[in-house]
Amino acid sequence: MLRKLSLLLACTALAACTSDKSAPSAEQAVPELNGNQLTLSDGTSIVWLKDNAGDRLMPRTLFPEASDLLISELGLQEGIPASVSTFLMHADGEWCLFDTGLGASHGGQMLSGMTELGLTPDSISIVYLTHFHGDHIGGMLQDDQPLFAHAQVYASAVEYQAWINEMPAERNGQQRQVMEAYQDRLHLFQFGDTLTHGIVALDAVGHTPGHTAFEKAELLVIGDLMHGAALQMQHPEISGNYDMDKAKAAESRERILKYAAEKHLFMAGMHLPEPAFIANN
């Protein structure tokens, strides 16, 4: 019940940001959400892959800027429904991944989800990374070797610079190991670049220095823009302790939520409540 309430609050908040006169007309092709799969108007399929086992609640202590009164008013005293998620994309005959989760050695379930769909790591042609935290790049390696033998990897140049060239060595061991393993297949982009399959990389910095959102047709993959959608959809000014720069994260959240509302975009987020999609109305 708590999860349903939280998702309803999130969807209502996004819908409230738009006016009826700006809604898509009946003649326009619209995306279709069916369970854990979103089909875009251009035929691209986006499939949610659950990476965490069981249910996931973010503790209210993750959001110290939120008052106890606000948490109580939203009915979130038990925690804020969330997930650890990745997303598959099937476009132009290729299977692609947005982020790779925790990794099987840390309890990640991504590979199990792929197996259920009849896919293996060799099926993946491209991996797009929203940022370099361990629950997003943890699935890149298996037994210290690249898991995705045929995949090209796309990552923010800003994120790469911050983690690989500027971060103290005691904080970037996993990041260096992953980037070195894929160095010959790594493509660094700038914000605003159009990548393969028409995906546009958008500035979503704050959670990490180069945190990226990806826009594809009616979809916006928002990474870790929100860790508690039921709270942050209505109060984007509230950041979580996971955000490396809380002020920048709040600015990005407000800007991107407004952008998604104005363009009627579905959002897919790595910590949104299951099944990790938020509709635009």
Task: Give the location of each predicted region.
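Active-site neighborhood of phospho(di)ester-bond hydrolases with catalytic His/Asp-centered motifs
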Residues: 97-100, 125-135, 154-156, 189, ...
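Active-site environment of divalent metal-dependent phosphoester hydrolases
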Residues: 57, 105, 132-139, 208-212, ...
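Sec-dependent signal peptide recognition
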Residues: 2-8
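Cap/insert and terminal regions of metallo-dependent hydrolase folds
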Residues: 218-281
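Active-site HxH/HxHxD metal-binding segment of metal-dependent hydrolases
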Residues: 101-182
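Metallo-beta-lactamase
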Residues: 17-111, 115, 126, 152-203, 218-224, 248-264
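Hydrophobic h-region of N-terminal signal peptides that target proteins for export
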Residues: 11-16
